[in-house]
Amino acid sequence: MQDAVTDRFENIFGSDRSLTSVVKRVYHIPVLLALMAFMFAARLRRLDVFQTGDGVTFRGNDPWYHFRQTSYALDHFPSTMPFDPMTNYPMGTNAEQFGTLYDQLVAGFILLTSFGDPTPEYAGLIMLIAAPVFGVAAVVPAYFIAARFAGRGPALAGISVLALLPGTFLNYTLVGFYDHSAAEVFFQTLGVLAFIVALTVAEREQPVWELVVDRDFNALRNPLTYSIGAGIAAGLYMWAWPPGVLLVGFTGVFFAIKLTSEVYHGNSPEPIAFVAAVSMTVTGLMMFVPLSTFSIGGSTDYSLLQVLLPLGEIGRAHV
C-alpha cells in the first residue's frame, strides 16, 4: 500500500521534489481555483437584491418556471411537474421542454443538505445561486479540453479571458437567473470532454472486434469504461435540455468523418467505431427514461427522436 502511494506521488510530482519542480507541475491547480473563486464572487455580488422580506425574486421570466418545477420536486421528489399551467397562461405548456435534470439536481441538493425539511428561505437561496455554481463548474471541463489541445498555460489564459468576458455566458450565470442555460453549458462541455477522453483511450488501447468476440474484458476495460462515461455524459446533457440531441448529431458527423479518414489512411477504424457504438447505445437507452411520446416529435420534447438518433449512430459505426 505504501509503495502504491509513493508511486502515485511520484507520478504527480515526479522524482525531482524541489520547490521549483513541484510548482511547475501543480501551479495550474491554485491558479484555476483562484479564477473559479473570482468568477463565483463576481456572479454573487448582487445576491442581496434578490432576497426580500417576502421571499426571493428572480431576474427575468424564465427562472419562474424552474422555481415552480423545483418547488414541485421538493414535495414530490424525484418527480417533476409534467405540465406548467402558468407558462403561456391560460393554455399552459408541456414542462419537459425545459429539461428536468436541473430541477432534480437542485431539489435533491436542497433536500439532502436540509435533511428533508428545507425552509422556503433556504430553498430560495440555493435556487438563487444555482446558476453561478453551474457556470463556474463548467470551467473545469472547459479547462481540460483546452489543456488537451493547447497545454496548461494557454488553457489558463483562456479561462482568464472567460472570467473577464461580458456577454451571454455571464448573463446566464449571474445570481438570480435560475434557468437551465447554465446547466446546458456545464453538461455540454462535460459531454465534449468525455468523448475526447474516450477517443484518446480508444486510440491508445486499440479495442478491436476480435477482443469483443474473445470477451477479453481486461483489454476492453478502459475503452469500455470511458465510452460508457461518454454516453452517460451525452445522456445527462439531453436530460437537462432535450434539444441537446444536437450534440449527438455533431458527434455523429465527427464519427463519420473520422471513420472515413482512418480507412483512407490505412488505419483500423474499429477503435473509433467501438467508442461510437458503446457511447451511443448508452445514450439511446438513457433516453427511454424521460420518453413521453412514442412518435418522432420536435427536439424540444422527449420523443423517439432522442432515442433513434443515437441508436442510428450504432448502425453507422458498424457499416
Language-model-derived ranges and their functions:
Residues 56-60, 265-318:
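Transmembrane helical bundles and short interhelical boundary loops of multi-pass, membrane-embedded
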Residues 44-189, 200, 207, 242:
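Active-site lumenal/periplasmic loops and adjacent helix-entry segments of GT-C-fold
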Residues 70, 76-77, 92, 201, ...:
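Short loop/turn hinge sites at secondary-structure boundaries
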Residues 36-40, 130-148, 153-218, 222-260, ...:
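Membrane-embedded helix bundles of polyisoprenyl
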Residues 1-27, 202-225, 229, 265-274, ...:
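Membrane-interfacial, low-structure loops and terminal tails that flank and connect transmembrane helices
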Residues 1-51, 61, 137, 142, ...:
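Start-transfer (signal-anchor) and selected internal transmembrane alpha helices
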Residues 29-32, 121, 224:
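Primarily residues marking transmembrane-helix entry/exit sites
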Residues 1-28, 236, 242-245, 249, ...:
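Alpha-helical transmembrane segments and their immediate interhelical/interface regions
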